[in-house]
């Protein structure tokens, strides 16, 4: 089960109703209250929260979700599909997607989003015929992203990830984690506290600041 705060998409009837003040929008306090209510309801039905917005019964957590939150590479196929690969997979990626060209020298991770429309994709299904929005991340950016995603997991940021990040970020990482712990966003185990869960944007934003050095 996934539980997310309401997102109002531009151009929808809902957005027009909000703009015309015909539909109320919950504020941050309302959203936090609803998240806590959903957590209590799902917990009473045997569901445990394993990620900020994801719940499952014991042993039934979604493996693709866990792969995404822990930085494991994944391939998405079709219009709008997203993919992510590490630098060690670039050579294989180049053979399947020659249109991407050579990545920047400092790239450690690549994110792809397929922009090919359905009609063209049906007529030209080969991977080499597809178009993508491409984003390259440096090693430091990749580690900051993994720290941010790790903080979304109920089990928290792993010691192995902290060790890898410290090799690149040094004392900046320790200072950031100490600050987040002192401000009660993270527990000593580096798992998100209830405050960190409800005020996730602050927690993730401060971790992402490590990406710029």
Model-predicted regions and their roles:
Residues 141-148, 174, 197, 201:
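Non-catalytic, well-ordered alpha-helical scaffold segments
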Residues 1-167:
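C-terminal scaffold of the Radical SAM
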Residues 181-190:
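A short, conserved structural fragment
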Residues 156-157, 186, 213:
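Intrinsically disordered or highly flexible coil/loop and linker segments, enriched in small
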Residues 166-181:
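Short amphipathic alpha-helical interaction segments
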Residues 195-213:
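Short, amphipathic alpha-helical interaction segments positioned at domain boundaries
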Residues 38-42, 180, 203:
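Hydrophobic alpha-helical packing residues
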């Amino acid at each position: 089960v996934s539980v997310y705060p309401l997102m109002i998409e531009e151009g929808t009837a809902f957005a027009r109703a909000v703009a015309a003040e015909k539909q109320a929008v919950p504020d941050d306090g309302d959203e936090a209250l609803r998240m806590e209510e959903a957590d209590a309801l799902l917990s009473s039905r045997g569901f445990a929260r394993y990620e900020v917005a994801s719940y499952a019964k014991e042993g039934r957590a979604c493996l693709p979700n866990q792969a995404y939150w822990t930085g494991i590479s994944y391939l998405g196929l079709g219009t709008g599909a997203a993919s992510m690969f590490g630098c060690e997979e670039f050579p294989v990626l180049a053979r399947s997607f020659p249109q991407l060209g050579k990545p920047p020298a400092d790239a450690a991770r690549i994110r792809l989003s397929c922009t090919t429309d359905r009609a063209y994709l049906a007529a030209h299904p080969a991977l080499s015929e597809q178009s993508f929005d491409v984003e390259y991340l440096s090693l430091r950016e990749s580690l900051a992203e993994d720290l941010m995603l790790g903080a979304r997991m109920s089990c928290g940021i792993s010691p192995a990830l902290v060790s890898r990040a410290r090799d690149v970020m040094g004392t900046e990482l320790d200072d950031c984690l100490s600050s987040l712990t002192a401000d009660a966003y993270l527990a000593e185990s580096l798992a998100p506290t209830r405050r960190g869960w409800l005020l996730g944007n602050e927690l993730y934003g401060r971790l992402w600041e490590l990406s710029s050095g």
